[in-house]
């Protein structure tokens, strides 16, 4: 039986409140990029979406490229990630955010519902502050969970474990 690779799309909020999460996501992307059975896409966003997939294996370059600040259009970023999905049942989209949507909440929820109906694995990773305490909009996180996104606030070690479980 042939095993097809997994596509993992890291969708990372780069608004001003997300600095510690950006470092964490850059390191996660580089680790995932080194795995043989994983294709990594790295997408960062504020009100604009920037695809840094070509840098996914180089966390230092990612950190030098991102520009923290600006608003937050999670819906636009998720719609971009949706356009990257080639094999829904072998795709994980991990949204790393504080879930404070500055764009259209309805667009975000509709996109999440569509992806879930295609059996894309959806992980919402809540932002952590410098003391590893969760800092996020729990009401929006709950609405995403209601539409099929698994949402958690985890340290990088626990995120790796969670991702491994989802990809089994």
Model-assigned labels for residue ranges:
Residues 1-9, 16-168:
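Acidic, glycine-rich A-domain
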